[in-house]
Design a protein with these regions (language model features):
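Signature of multi-pass transmembrane helix bundles
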Residues: 1-114
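Conserved structured core elements
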Residues: 58, 94, 98, 129-130, ...
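Inter-domain interface/hinge segments
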Residues: 122, 136-142, 148, 152-153
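Well-ordered alpha-helical segments within folded domains of soluble proteins
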Residues: 128-136, 184-191, 234-239
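Hydrophobic alpha-helical bundle architecture
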Residues: 139-147, 163-232
Length: 240
């Protein structure tokens, strides 16, 4: 592995070299200019853009929701979502926030346990895509919002997540010691706020509050307990 965590340059099996790219210079990346991203521009775009330009968020809403439903129905991983659905109500309540949290946790349960369904990613991570998308879809359904409004809110959630990731630098955004569910949970909170009619100033404060709440969450590797971390991050996000 050279230069990047996903840049495999040498592979062998026994005495057989499958490929060797160690002598080749690393491909130079064209830097992406994120300076156009701001909270106000994100909100304006997602509110005014024609629906055909929001095809990706629309697909994310459908695909990630299907994965969450699979997680609620099957026995995947730690079954965080199913546990919250079946036994969380007496202690934690059974209202809006719990429904939003358990749906997202179920999606991560299913993904981390290898469910044969795709997840639409955010910033290269399926768990981040689930975390910033599924809660918004769940909230939109609970609030009985039309599908086009839910898609616009999903776009807000994903773009706000990307905005925060760009502030931590290219290397930190790609592989961070922090659990990036915190960033994505903030995006989800912004998407839900957008559904409620909150403006750009409010959404910026929401994101700042979320990051202040859960910024100390550390990544200890991708595995089943990611679902529990997503649940904790979303709990802090919904408080914001």
């Amino acid at each position: 592995v050279q230069d990047r965590h996903d840049a495999v340059v040498y592979l062998s099996r026994g005495d057989t070299v499958c490929f060797d790219r160690r002598t080749q210079p690393a491909a130079s990346e064209v830097p992406v200019d994120y300076s156009a991203l701001s909270v106000s521009r994100i909100v304006s775009f997602c509110r005014e853009a024609p629906m055909e330009s929001l095809a990706r968020p629309a697909e994310a809403a459908v695909r990630n929701w299907a994965l969450c439903e699979e997680g609620l129905q099957g026995r995947y991983g730690m079954q965080v979502g199913r546990t919250l659905m079946q036994g969380g109500a007496p202690l934690l309540g059974d209202g809006f926030a719990m429904e939003v949290i358990r749906v997202a946790c179920a999606g991560v349960d299913a993904r981390m346990a290898g469910a044969p369904l795709p997840a639409m990613s955010n910033s290269g991570s399926g768990n981040q895509g689930l975390t910033c998308t599924a809660p918004v879809v769940a909230a939109g359904r609970l609030l009985e919002r039309p599908q086009d409004e839910i898609v616009r809110a999903v776009a807000v959630a994903n773009l706000m997540t990307i905005l925060v990731k760009t502030q931590s630098g290219p290397d930190e955004g790609r592989m961070s010691p922090a659990c990036c569910a915190a960033f994505a949970a903030g995006g989800a909170a912004c998407g839900i706020g957008f559904l409620r009619g909150d403006g750009a100033d409010c959404l910026e404060r929401v994101m700042q509050t979320v990051l202040g709440n859960v910024c100390g969450l550390i990544c200890d590797g991708a595995k089943a307990n990611c679902a529990a971390k997503v649940g904790m991050a979303l709990h802090g996000a919904l408080q914001a």
